[in-house]
């Protein structure tokens, strides 16, 4: 028996030459692919969805479960708060760690100073916000940690020297962090 590959291929060609045409092979391939596509597109209610016995499951059996998101807590929006007073102190906090933020303390007439987190000095300069030293300011901000005593207020917008400086959006997100 001759088992050389070229000899075996020639015998196979001779046997299939009259029985199978290239058009028939191509046609069968197309029909097979179309059948697979149609089968994949059928809804589960016709195909049983992989369940034995088929049929439709009762909707009342479905339970709504909260998604497990470790480390996340439910979000409650902070209420915007009005503030006004005279600036008694200005400081840039966090410059040593790379996120310098201007903080001001205002005397709002209650006898206690209120700490207010404003914005990075570079952003204040970029938007043309005037100096806070000794100025009378007013504006709107958010306290994101109301349970903490003396929690600072984060400025949404502040008016100083007759100019309004917009620093955060309605959700409290910093405008200087927005990608332009």
Curated annotation (Swiss-Prot):
The keyword Mitochondrion does not apply. Induction: Part of the probable 18 gene mamAB operon. It is found in: Magnetosome membrane. Residues 1-21 are cytoplasmic. Disruption phenotype: Cells have a weak magnetic response and make magnetosome membranes. Magnetite crystals are amorphous, smaller than wild-type and irregularly spaced. Deletion of genes mamH to mamV (amb0961 to amb0978) gives cells with no magnetosomes and no magnetic response. GO terms for cellular component: magnetosome membrane. It is a single-pass membrane protein. Belongs to the magnetosome MamS family. May play a role in magnetite crystal growth and size. This bacteria makes up to 20 cubo-octahedral magnetosomes of about 45 nm in diameter which contain membrane-bound crystals of magnetite (Fe(3)O(4)). This is Magnetosome protein MamS.
């Amino acid at each position: 028996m001759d088992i050389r590959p070229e000899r075996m291929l020639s015998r196979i060609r001779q046997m299939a030459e009259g029985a199978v045409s290239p058009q028939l092979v191509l046609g069968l391939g197309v029909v097979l692919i179309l059948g697979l596509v149609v089968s994949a597109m059928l809804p589960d209610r016709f195909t049983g969805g992989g369940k034995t016995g088929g049929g439709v499951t009762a909707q009342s059996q479905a339970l709504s479960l909260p998604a497990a998101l470790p480390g996340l807590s439910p979000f409650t929006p902070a209420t915007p708060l009005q503030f006004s007073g005279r600036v008694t102190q200005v400081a840039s906090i966090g410059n040593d760690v790379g996120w310098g933020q201007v903080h001001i303390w205002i005397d709002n007439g209650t006898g206690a100073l209120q700490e207010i987190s404003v914005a990075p000095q570079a952003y204040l300069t970029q938007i043309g916000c005037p100096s806070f030293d000794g100025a009378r300011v007013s504006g709107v901000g958010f306290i994101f940690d109301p349970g903490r005593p003396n929690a600072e207020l984060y400025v949404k917008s502040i008016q100083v020297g007759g100019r309004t400086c917009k620093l955060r959006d309605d959700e409290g997100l910093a405008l200087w962090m927005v990608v332009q």
